[in-house]
């Protein structure tokens, strides 16, 4: 599947950077919330065996996804992005 097709399956908040990686910044209220989200993403990453780069700063988490083995984007990066999107979606009671 082409990047353009896969791109349509994830949140528009993800940027495709130089055709090489996906990046999304999530704004949060404080450092603790950013760290908590990073830990939740880490749990998903461990289960999937696909690990994003996570940059935690005050009130912000930057998530970067690419496949190291090919030094670029793979379908697995988009699958992981969709899983992160699901985590960030507000739950409906």
Where are these regions (language model features)?
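Long, contiguous binding/interaction regions
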Residues: 1-93
């Amino acid at each position: 599947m082409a990047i353009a097709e896969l791109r349509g399956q994830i949140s528009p908040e993800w940027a495709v950077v130089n055709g090489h990686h996906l990046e999304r910044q999530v704004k949060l209220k404080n450092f603790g919330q950013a760290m908590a989200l990073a830990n939740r993403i880490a749990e998903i990453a461990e289960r999937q065996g696909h690990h994003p780069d996570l940059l935690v700063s005050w009130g912000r988490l930057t998530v970067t996804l690419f496949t190291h083995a090919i030094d670029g984007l793979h379908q697995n990066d988009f699958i992981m992005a969709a899983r992160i999107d699901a985590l960030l979606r507000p739950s409906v009671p």
